[in-house]
Amino acid sequence: MVSVPTAWCSVALALLVALHEGKDQAAATLEQPASSPRARAAHLRLRRCSCSSWLDKECVYFCHLDIIWVNTPGQTAPYGLGNPPRRRRRSLPGRCECSSARDPACATFCHQRSRADAVGVPGSQSSADAFQAGKTWATPGELLRTLRDISAAKTHFAKRQQEATREPRTTHSRHRKR
């Protein structure tokens, strides 16, 4: 009869041998594609087109085919985009530039107006939508005035909250202590 520790040792040894053999097979399959000079280069992400702004999330989602999108509380952020040269981004005339001129869906998407511009009425967009569409403030001082107004409103609200907590609460006559 075989003792229990001996049985466990033989099972563990068989498992290690099987894992070691599987490791050799996996390494052989990984070496085959790496032997070509093109595969040794850095991983290039598949792109249908190049967006002129990373803030245009609809364009980034359309153009970059293998992006992993990470959900964060404030926004959905693309993971693994990399950082292309700024000169190329600035030189793009429209929303994006297609990598293949024979792609009609890409040409239609890149040369049409953005959805926010097509649907919205001028002046009805939120500041976030206007920022995503690439628009700037009408006057240089408008942003500063808006921030000052927000700050004043927050200060006023904080003062009112403090005054409300300082006022003594009136209790009902039946609940007063004698």
Curated annotation (Swiss-Prot):
<dbReference type="InterPro" id="IPR001928">
    <property type="entry name" value="Endothln-like_toxin"/>
</dbReference>
<dbReference type="GO" id="GO:0005179">
    <property type="term" value="F:hormone activity"/>
</dbReference>
<dbReference type="Pfam" id="PF00322">
    <property type="entry name" value="Endothelin"/>
</dbReference>
<dbReference type="InterPro" id="IPR020475">
    <property type="entry name" value="Endothelin"/>
</dbReference>
<keyword id="KW-0838">Vasoactive</keyword>
<keyword id="KW-0964">Secreted</keyword>
<keyword id="KW-0732">Signal</keyword>
<feature type="propeptide">
    <location>
        <begin position="70"/>
        <end position="178"/>
    </location>
</feature>
<feature type="signal peptide">
    <location>
        <begin position="1"/>
        <end position="24"/>
    </location>
</feature>
<keyword id="KW-0165">Cleavage on pair of basic residues</keyword>
<protein>
    <recommendedName>
        <fullName>Endothelin-2</fullName>
    </recommendedName>
</protein>
<keyword id="KW-0839">Vasoconstrictor</keyword>
<feature type="region of interest" description="Endothelin-like">
    <location>
        <begin position="96"/>
        <end position="111"/>
    </location>
</feature>
<dbReference type="GO" id="GO:0014826">
    <property type="term" value="P:vein smooth muscle contraction"/>
</dbReference>
<dbReference type="GO" id="GO:0005615">
    <property type="term" value="C:extracellular space"/>
</dbReference>
<dbReference type="InterPro" id="IPR019764">
    <property type="entry name" value="Endothelin_toxin_CS"/>
</dbReference>
<feature type="region of interest" description="Disordered">
    <location>
        <begin position="154"/>
        <end position="178"/>
    </location>
</feature>
<dbReference type="GO" id="GO:0006874">
    <property type="term" value="P:intracellular calcium ion homeostasis"/>
</dbReference>
<dbReference type="GO" id="GO:0031708">
    <property type="term" value="F:endothelin B receptor binding"/>
</dbReference>
<keyword id="KW-1015">Disulfide bond</keyword>
<feature type="compositionally biased region" description="Basic and acidic residues">
    <location>
        <begin position="160"/>
        <end position="170"/>
    </location>
</feature>
<comment type="similarity">
    <text>Belongs to the endothelin/sarafotoxin family.</text>
</comment>
<feature type="site" description="Cleavage; by KEL">
    <location>
        <begin position="69"/>
        <end position="70"/>
    </location>
</feature>
<dbReference type="GO" id="GO:0003100">
    <property type="term" value="P:regulation of systemic arterial blood pressure by endothelin"/>
</dbReference>
<comment type="function">
    <text>Endothelins are endothelium-derived vasoconstrictor peptides.</text>
</comment>
<dbReference type="GO" id="GO:0019229">
    <property type="term" value="P:regulation of vasoconstriction"/>
</dbReference>
<feature type="disulfide bond">
    <location>
        <begin position="49"/>
        <end position="63"/>
    </location>
</feature>
<feature type="propeptide">
    <location>
        <begin position="25"/>
        <end position="46"/>
    </location>
</feature>
<feature type="disulfide bond">
    <location>
        <begin position="51"/>
        <end position="59"/>
    </location>
</feature>
